[in-house]
Amino acid sequence: MTAQTLYDKLWNSHVVREEEDGTVLLYIDRHLVHEVTSPQAFEGLKMAGRKLWRIDSVVSTADHNTPTGDWDKGIQDPISKLQVDTLDKNIKEFGALAYFPFMDKGQGIVHVMGPEQGATLPGMTVVCGDSHTSTHGAFGALAHGIGTSEVEHTMATQCITAKKSKSMLIAVDGKLKAGVTAKDVALYIIGQIGTAGGTGYAVEFGGEAIRSLSMEGRMTLCNMAIEAGARSGMVAVDQTTIDYVKDKPFAPEGEAWDKAVEYWRTLVSDEGAVFDKEYRFNAEDIEPQVTWGTSPEMVLDISSKVPNPAEETDPVKRSGMERALEYMGLEAGTPLNEIPVDIVFIGSCTNSRIEDLREAAAIAKDRKKAANVQRVLIVPGSGLVKEQAEKEGLDKIFIEAGFEWREPGCSMCLAMNADRLTPGQRCASTSNRNFEGRQGNGGRTHLVSPAMAAAAAVTGRFTDIRMMA
């Protein structure tokens, strides 16, 4: 039998029908639903007189539009309130396996809530009307975002139409240095292959450095796969995966658990499996990263200087660099560790889990927010993350440092709620995108790890966390 990649196994086990041109009907196991991309889909079902094909495949929460402060005042923005209220009504009418509404203890960012509830399991196909659905590939699952019309199609048929992507292996060999996190690995990879490097591919991450990551680190890495242009990102199942899933609310139990684990252990690329493309990187080459421009690929290690567009020979790239520097208000040659910040945001589906908050708290402990830093927002990814952080006293560390301890939600990752930048504000952010206006009109976003963000908060500028022992 031909050796298969993990992607081959996941894809082939979910093909319902294949046409001559390679288009397939792909069966979907888990559908994650939030308030932004679901209203039109539910409305389409109503107009056609249809019901959900499988109610028990749907897990839902409100996250994009929910405020992360002053919950006693409710949702003030009328459009945001309408979307959240509409989700409430639609779930009550159509049903779901689980629904965590606004202010529920389990509510949170869909890509944080799903895994912590055990709604994401190895071997599944997982879709959501959100581009960062690739996060769930960390479990040895095939996960990717879909558009609103596909949301409706999945609700009605439990399938999507798709064509198989090419396969790519990105291996990081060796051991990561102290102070280097999964976020740094993700940004480094994107810096090396570019934001189009993974276009048309399903990416499997492998190598010693990847296997050493926790599940939360793997989720961060797979979350960022889309920023390299990939359709999906995934990590093979190992004991780390199985240990994380065990005893989660929606994980199998008893004999079903034993059978599931037996199957899950097969979710690895076979020896000799051939990928369409491979990249290999050395973990020793990766340092703490900071983006300097308006694309995740515009990234360098903290010891670098802002690049000079004049040294770029490609005229298209040179023009892009010039525009980025103008928007970001930076001058070529400026050391990254001399760039001051106005705002710090620690949160998002990339970096708002308990390990992320622990990393940030370790830096913030016994330190204070720098005088030039206007605000530091700490936004846990879910109510359960918030609860755990408070049990560990992390909230007290943040508050004593002068940071804001917020309620769960997508928050300042994107300007769809009350948390946003104003024109010209420079933000050290643990989110996944640094596009123009992503965090607010005219806002300037620098992507970093949680520890690097916390370091910027207490020093007032980008700082190598390895210098803060």
UniProtKB/Swiss-Prot annotation:
InterPro entries: 3-IsopropMal_deHydase_lsu, Acnase/IPM_dHydase_lsu_aba_1/3, Acoase/IPM_deHydtase_lsu_aba, Aconitase_4Fe-4S_BS, Aconitase_4Fe-4S_dom, IPM_dehydratase_rel_enz, IPMI_cat. The keyword 4Fe-4S applies. Binds 1 [4Fe-4S] cluster per subunit. It catalyses: (2R,3S)-3-isopropylmalate = (2S)-2-isopropylmalate. GO terms for biological process: L-leucine biosynthetic process. Keywords: 4Fe-4S, Amino-acid biosynthesis, Branched-chain amino acid biosynthesis, Iron, Iron-sulfur, Leucine biosynthesis, Lyase, Metal-binding. Disulfide bonds: none annotated. Pathway: Amino-acid biosynthesis; L-leucine biosynthesis; L-leucine from 3-methyl-2-oxobutanoate: step 2/4. Belongs to the aconitase/IPM isomerase family. LeuC type 1 subfamily. This is 3-isopropylmalate dehydratase large subunit. The lineage of its organism: Bacteria, Pseudomonadati, Pseudomonadota, Betaproteobacteria, Neisseriales.
